[in-house]
């Protein structure tokens, strides 16, 4: 799977709140996702793309979905990165904060700084910028999902959507919001 954007250790993106729980893996049936995942992992030579500190890899590769989120409410799949579990955590500071609190985020920030080759203050700034972008994007309630990176190459059968396949798909995490707002009694 060729990269549309260069790999960047510095670019951390948090998932907007309305899209929590959403992923290509969660939208596809297992057979479709496994094809995409396996291609991403084997195209990297079954190695972690991040290749951070020696001895930090546990040998298990995970497929990290790289999405871009724009102000118009379009979420676009850009790339799938094979990452070891330890490196994968570096790109999910929101999850770490939710599960381990500020102490966990502080530990993650130190690891991120070492792996990215930056000072701790710079790592904190990058995570803060990601949290700021997250708060803005989380205000958008309707999202259009663009999986065109993989859908022309792999048949993606939808699991959660009421579509036979995925490509461009509107996602409304609150499907009854329009009915409630349109109700004459509201």
Language-model features: locations:
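Sequence/structural segment immediately N-terminal to covalent heme-attachment motifs in c-type
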Residues: 38-44
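Histidine-centered nuclease catalytic patch
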Residues: 29-37, 49-82, 91-99
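Conserved N-terminal glycine/acidic-rich loop preference
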Residues: 85
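A boundary/linker detector
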Residues: 1-38, 52-57, 102-186
């Amino acid at each position: 799977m060729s990269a549309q954007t260069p790999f960047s250790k510095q670019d951390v993106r948090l998932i907007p709140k309305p899209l929590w729980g959403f992923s290509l893996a969660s939208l596809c049936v297992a057979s479709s996702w496994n094809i995409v995942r396996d291609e991403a992992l084997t195209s990297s030579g079954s190695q972690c793309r991040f290749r951070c500190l020696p001895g930090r890899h546990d040998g298990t590769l995970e497929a990290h979905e790289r999405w871009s989120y724009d102000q118009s409410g379009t979420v676009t799949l850009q790339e799938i990165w094979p990452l070891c579990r330890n490196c994968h955590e570096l790109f999910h500071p929101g999850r770490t904060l939710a599960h381990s609190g500020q102490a966990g985020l502080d530990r993650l920030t130190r690891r991120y700084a070492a792996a990215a080759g930056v000072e701790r203050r710079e790592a904190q700034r990058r995570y803060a910028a990601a949290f700021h972008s997250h708060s803005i994007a989380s205000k958008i309630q309707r999202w259009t999902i663009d999986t065109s990176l993989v859908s022309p190459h792999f048949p993606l059968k939808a699991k959660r959507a009421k579509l036979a396949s995925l490509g461009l798909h509107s996602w409304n995490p609150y499907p009854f919001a329009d009915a409630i707002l349109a109700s004459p009694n509201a």
